[in-house]
Amino acid sequence: MAEDIIPNFDRISAEDQRVLEKAVYHHSDYRLPDTLTEREKTFCKIIREADQLDIFRTIVESGWETIYGCGREEILASEISDAIAEAFFRRQLADYAKRSTPADYHLAHIALCFGLESKAARKRALEQGYLQQMMELTFLRPEVQEKYIRLKTEAENYLTEEEKTEGAGGADS
């Protein structure tokens, strides 16, 4: 696998090869395994953050219809489930298995911001502007919009805080 991507991969030490392979293999796991070493977790987090930033770009550039199979109007007419809202209030990644409405699918992607643990990644997300574009939402029902504003505020506060506490981003921090 890696030898196809990284030239001279065979010249990297066996330990470094193992770390890189684990990082690539686990970077998209909802929760990182407890069995990873600190070094392996660090590499996973680097790849995860790059991937999350790319997901924001892909959603904006590809459009909602392509990504979600429904249009903006359908998403903005739907509800926000308590399970997805709770992820925002806990400042954690949303469990994709708990998405139940069109809005949940979009908000679960916005919640990826809680996986941006490094200041550099949060700064880059703000500089790129894709996440802010994803968060420009006005839900059709006032009670849903009110709930969304609280979620959006939580995400914006997270992105602009200087220091992250241990455990931010979920159980895999």
Indicate residue ranges for each PLM-predicted region.
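An active-site-proximal "capping" alpha-helix that borders the catalytic cofactor pocket
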Residues: 1-7
